[in-house]
Curated annotation (Swiss-Prot):
Name assigned to this protein: Acyl-lipid omega-3 desaturase (cytochrome b5), endoplasmic reticulum
PANTHER family, alphabetized: OMEGA-6 FATTY ACID DESATURASE, CHLOROPLASTIC
Pathway: Lipid metabolism; polyunsaturated fatty acid biosynthesis
Bilayer topology: Multi-pass membrane protein
TM ranges: 63-83, 220-240, 242-262
InterPro entries, per the entry: FA_desaturase_dom, FAS_N, Fatty_acid_desaturase
Domain of life assignment: Eukaryota
GO process annotations (BP): unsaturated fatty acid biosynthetic process
UniProt motif Histidine box-2: location: 137-141
Domain remark text: The histidine box domains may contain the active site and/or be involved in metal ion binding.
Region of interest (Disordered), residue spans: 1-30
Record motif Histidine box-1, residues: 101-105
Amino acid sequence: MVVAMDQRTNVNGDPGAGDRKKEERFDPSAQPPFKIGDIRAAIPKHCWVKSPLRSMSYVVRDIIAVAALAIAAVYVDSWFLWPLYWAAQGTLFWAIFVLGHDCGHGSFSDIPLLNSVVGHILHSFILVPYHGWRISHRTHHQNHGHVENDESWVPLPERVYKKLPHSTRMLRYTVPLPMLAYPLYLCYRSPGKEGSHFNPYSSLFAPSERKLIATSTTCWSIMFVSLIALSFVFGPLAVLKVYGVPYIIFVMWLDAVTYLHHHGHDEKLPWYRGKEWSYLRGGLTTIDRDYGIFNNIHHDIGTHVIHHLFPQIPHYHLVDATKAAKHVLGRYYREPKTSGAIPIHLVESLVASIKKDHYVSDTGDIVFYETDPDLYVYASDKSKIN
């Protein structure tokens, strides 16, 4: 096993202190003493049951809420209230995304046609190519925690990081710019990777999936053209107020939540390569989060560890499944910090992580994020130092 990690020894004069420290210290990169089958066996049977009616009830709930908010905002049309509308509607757009995400996993129902139709409607409405994103997200789940093969917010190897222009590094690691990256990711993927979620011939997809990608790109295009048509009818400002700004809020939710589920824990968590990676070890690097009042609105997306290991579990069973699995996971499960009504504490975790988690070593089968000490030292400051 090759580990790229600082090793610190305790030298305080107490001959027994080192042993006690070793016993107390938990190594999150150590092989877990359980198998994924042990976790599966601990999850109650009802957690695996998918109800199309229950899933559709959440769709109806969210669509009614989105429509009601839009109608109310247009009717009142007050610049004092528009910011409240943007925040609320953008949050609901994110909730709609989560339901479409469930369709992509097949946790929405056991009916593939229903999953595909509902998924296309929901994701196209918020300008997400359903099959394109579904397939790349499947790759993310199948390779979670793998430095090279993971797909979402994958860490950059040092050699790739060092080749990026300083301006690109600043864009990637200066808040809030990374929280606006999703549309670019759909078009170009992440640094070090190539392909588009819209192109049927992208390296993201197998030849057998090209028709699916073409279908989703067509649905996306219909929505995009519809927005342009609406801007001619009602004016660009009206479309921007009703749809455009909430879309930006949705993108920020998506990027922030996705990032926080794989970064920003108080202790450094491992990323794997080669023989050290396994589906279980990669999944155990994910992090649960408490989003306060948004937990229910966002369909319990914060219960992320069990979701990553068993994406076929419906979102409305994830809380029960997580509670049941904790005794098996032990210290490999990191209890999320309890949130107030608004999860302000997560902003601190997000900013701190972006400022220090920049790249991983080019070598080693178990690696941890490292910090570029010169990233925020601008050219003028560097010249003074030199």
